[in-house]
């Protein structure tokens, strides 16, 4: 796996699924392929994206700044600086300085990543801030190692949170989660269906599912009533794809 492929993988792992994730993936591909060379426009685009947390925007801004060639005097962006200041905690800054001194001795991506993984997310973000603000310089490979260690820590905590929700025994949370998943699956079905005549059936199924979820939320239903809703949708989608001659893995 090439270095840039690895970086792209780690960065995308912390971005929530949806159309915005697909858009960000495309921008990263373009940047890594040298197709997008306007850093100013890229940062302006990133700043105005909805949904993303300030830290995620800071991480993406760090990647773009490392990768896109730019004028030496180009101003650093405030939204990235604020995101990479370790919440203003002096302890994070102290640890970031210690980490930076260790990273100066590293020359490889994997070496830097290993060193960085033993620090907290706040310290890692602060260390990225030091490099972003030109207070310290390391090789691009080492900076990418630091970045990927940060993404790995964030992805780990997101995974723990998702797992807790998936295994919760609270019937109300499970019920709502099934309905949310059914809605997003319906949306995916509509995108897969496209605009062909044969797509009408898949669109109809997706539309009915969304109406059902809306009705369930409006009138309030028994927590077990949503069981199997998403699986039924997926079966319908697979049946439609088979008829269209498309074989696709489940959205699971």
Swiss-Prot record:
SMART domains: Flu_M1_C. GO terms for cellular component: host cell nucleus; membrane; virion membrane. It comes from the Viruses. Its main location: virion. A motif (Nuclear localization signal) lies at residues 101-105. It is a peripheral membrane protein. InterPro entries: Flu_matrix_M1, Flu_matrix_M1_C, Flu_matrix_M1_N, Flu_matrix_M1_N_sub1, Flu_matrix_M1_N_sub2, INFV_M1. One of its GO terms (biological process) is viral budding from plasma membrane. Residues 165-252 are annotated as: RNP-binding. The keyword RNA-binding applies. The keyword Membrane applies. GO terms for molecular function: RNA binding; structural constituent of virion. Residues 1-164 are annotated as: Membrane-binding. It is found in: Virion membrane; Host nucleus. SUPFAM superfamilies: Influenza virus matrix protein M1. Keywords: Host nucleus, Membrane, RNA-binding, Viral matrix protein, Virion. Belongs to the influenza viruses Matrix protein M1 family. Most abundant protein in virion. When expressed alone can form virus-like particles in transfected cells. HAMAP family: INFV_M1. Plays critical roles in virus replication, from virus entry and uncoating to assembly and budding of the virus particle. M1 binding to ribonucleocapsids (RNPs) in nucleus seems to inhibit viral transcription. Interaction of viral NEP with M1-RNP is thought to promote nuclear export of the complex, which is targeted to the virion assembly site at the apical plasma membrane in polarized epithelial cells. Interactions with NA and HA may bring M1, a non-raft-associated protein, into lipid rafts. Forms a continuous shell on the inner side of the lipid bilayer in virion, where it binds the RNP. Determines the virion's shape: spherical or filamentous. Clinical isolates of influenza are characterized by the presence of significant proportion of filamentous virions, whereas after multiple passage on eggs or cell culture, virions have only spherical morphology. Filamentous virions are thought to be important to infect neighboring cells, and spherical virions more suited to spread through aerosol between hosts organisms. Homodimer and homomultimer. Interacts with NEP. Binds ribonucleocapsid by both interacting with genomic RNA and NP protein. May interact with HA and NA. Cannot bind NP without genomic RNA. This is Matrix protein 1. It comes from Influenza A virus (strain A/Chicken/Hong Kong/YU562/2001 H5N1 genotype B).
């Amino acid at each position: 796996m090439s270095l840039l492929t690895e970086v792209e993988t780690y960065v995308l792992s912390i971005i929530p699924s949806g159309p915005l994730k697909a858009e960000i993936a495309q921008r990263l591909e373009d940047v890594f392929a040298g197709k997008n060379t306007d850093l100013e426009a890229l940062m302006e685009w990133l700043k105005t994206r909805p949904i993303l947390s300030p830290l995620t925007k800071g991480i993406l801004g760090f990647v773009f700044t490392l990768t896109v060639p730019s004028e030496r005097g180009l101003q650093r962006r405030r939204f990235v600086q604020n995101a990479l200041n370790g919440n203003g905690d002096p302890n994070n800054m102290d640890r970031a300085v210690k980490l930076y001194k260790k990273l100066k001795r590293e020359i490889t991506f994997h070496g830097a990543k290993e060193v960085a993984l033993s620090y907290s997310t706040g310290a890692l973000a602060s260390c990225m801030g030091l490099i972003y603000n030109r207070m310290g310089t390391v090789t691009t490979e080492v900076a990418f190692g630091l970045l990927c260690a940060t993404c790995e820590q964030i992805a780990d905590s997101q995974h723990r949170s998702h797992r807790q929700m998936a295994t919760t025994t609270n019937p109300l949370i499970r019920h709502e989660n099934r309905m949310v998943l059914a809605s997003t699956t319906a949306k995916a079905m509509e995108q897969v269906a496209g605009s062909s005549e044969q797509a009408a059936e898949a669109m109809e199924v997706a539309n009915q599912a969304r109406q059902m979820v809306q009705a369930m939320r409006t009138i309030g239903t028994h927590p077990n009533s949503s069981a199997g809703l998403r699986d039924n949708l997926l079966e319908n989608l697979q049946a439609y794809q088979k008829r269209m001659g498309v074989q696709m893995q489940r959205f699971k």
